[in-house]
């Protein structure tokens, strides 16, 4: 039953983000696309921060008064279900459906997985694979690097991942909101931040520099993520930009599947190898972006 519930939860979660991104693409103009995707990304990161805090506050609490042994462990899941129900109601009531009605004589263009979109998806896979790789080894890296016990490891990992999410929110609500240029430039701006963050982590003599390295990676991700989704939508025609975003959202799924798998293999060889491994990926990113710009 637990396995089935996790499958259902993952299926809903995997569908909600592409659908939300596609909606943002459909209701924003080309000039507002990066800004809209930045707000969308910031909302996701706020949830990333508040979710663990909410779970920690609710676990063990039997706020429903049920006479069931260990029912308090299920409280976060019940509250999550209620929140999702409220979100669904909010969507149906308050979000306008601005779907364009096409005449029967006007053929609707279909989203095509052309060379440009293939390059874009490749860019997304690299970005999210590298990010997922770092996320998945953070706890192990902290524990092995500083010889922390389990409690200190959990607390420090929460601080680092929370800082990454917070810095992503900062860049998405400040830099991205004011930026009006090409979305690909946001990805290019993020690459030096990614490279710098990896070097800071690899050569950090203490926890402080490691902390700033993770924060810098969060800033980079706050630029790269909306830049990627905006570029994907602007790659399509006006009547299928939402579909393009939905298709482009396959990249985070692949990245968060491949990243943790690679991290285990690399980390078993050396604790710094995952960070060394992703450095060439960022240079590959530069090459792909350059090819995409030549096509455009």
Predicted regions and their residues:
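Hydrophobic core of transmembrane alpha-helices in multi-pass small-molecule transporters
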Residues: 1-15, 209-223
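Helix-loop-helix hairpin linking two adjacent transmembrane segments in secondary transporters
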Residues: 40-92
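C-terminal membrane-cytosol helix-exit motif in multi-pass small-molecule transporters
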Residues: 81-101, 286-292
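Juxtamembrane intracellular "pre-TM" segments in multi-pass secondary transporters
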Residues: 96-122
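Short amphipathic helix-loop junctions that connect adjacent transmembrane helices
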Residues: 137-156
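Helix-to-loop junctions at the C-terminal end of transmembrane segments
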Residues: 170-183, 267
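Structural signature of the two symmetry-related core transmembrane helices
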Residues: 185-200
């Amino acid at each position: 039953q637990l396995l089935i519930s996790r499958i259902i939860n993952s299926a809903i979660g995997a569908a909600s983000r592409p659908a939300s991104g596609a909606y943002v693409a459909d209701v924003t103009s080309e000039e507002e696309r990066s800004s809209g995707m930045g707000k969308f990304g910031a909302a996701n990161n706020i949830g990333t921060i508040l979710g663990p805090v909410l779970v920690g506050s609710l676990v063990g609490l039997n706020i429903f008064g049920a006479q069931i042994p260990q029912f308090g462990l299920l409280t976060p899941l019940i509250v999550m279900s209620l929140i999702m129900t409220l979100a669904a109601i909010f969507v149906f009531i308050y979000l306008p459906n601005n779907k364009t009605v096409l005449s029967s004589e006007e053929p609707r263009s279909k989203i095509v997985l052309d060379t440009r979109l293939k390059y874009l998806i490749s860019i997304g896979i690299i970005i999210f694979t590298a990010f997922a790789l770092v996320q998945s080894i953070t706890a192990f890296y902290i524990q092995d690097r500083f010889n922390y016990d389990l409690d200190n490891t959990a607390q420090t990992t929460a601080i680092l991942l929370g800082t990454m999410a917070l810095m992503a929110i900062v860049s998405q609500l400040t830099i991205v909101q004011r930026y009006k240029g090409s979305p690909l430039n946001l990805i290019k701006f993020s690459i030096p931040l990614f490279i710098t963050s990896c070097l800071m982590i690899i050569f950090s003599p203490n926890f402080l520099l490691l902390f700033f390295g993770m924060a810098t990676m969060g800033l980079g991700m706050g630029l790269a993520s909306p830049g990627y989704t905006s570029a994907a939508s602007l790659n399509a025609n006006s009547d299928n930009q939402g579909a393009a975003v939905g298709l482009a959202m396959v990249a985070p799924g692949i990245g968060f599947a491949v990243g943790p798998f690679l991290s285990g293999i690399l980390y078993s060889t050396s604790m710094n190898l995952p960070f060394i491994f992703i450095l060439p990926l960022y240079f590959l990113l530069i090459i792909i972006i350059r090819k995409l710009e030549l096509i455009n």
